[in-house]
Amino acid sequence: MIEPFERKIWLSSPTMHGDEMKYVAEAYETNWMSTVGKNIDETERLLAERVGVRYAVALSAGTASLHLAVKLAGEAMYGQAVIGKGSLSGKKVFCSDVTFGATVNPVVYEGGIPVFIDTERETWKIGRAHV
């Protein structure tokens, strides 16, 4: 029989700094419970300013960010996707064999074909000899 762990090891726990409830209440009271609003607009503006670009986009999760990056990379390489098809439609995309689903799923969502490449034991990078 497998014994359960005494303590849970969190993959990632939230970090709170004290003002979160104030901002949640403000969003609720002003009916800005959405992907837009002054807090998001200001976050995007500050981020763009900090990294020295004209625009930045705040997304709901890292997975959404990876999907957007894959979509834009596909469009930059192959042009705008046909309606109903992904930006990587039918294209093979090299992916590490040691990964998390969020890094491969956007390739599939965009119609690409993931090709898993062995990872080098010492560096955890895709092995050049395997490409």
Where do the protein language model's features map onto the residues?
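Glycine-rich phosphate-binding loop at the start of an alpha helix
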Residues: L59, T63, G101, K125
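N-terminal "arm"/small-domain region of PLP-dependent enzymes with the aminotransferase-like
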Residues: M1-S34
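Phosphate-binding glycine-rich loop
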Residues: V36-K92, P106-E110, F116-D118
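Conserved coil-to-alpha-helix start sites within the AMP-binding
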Residues: V98-V104
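Conserved small/polar residues in nucleotide/adenosyl-binding loops
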Residues: A129-V131
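Conserved PLP phosphate-binding loop immediately N-terminal to the Schiff-base lysine helix
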Residues: T119-K125
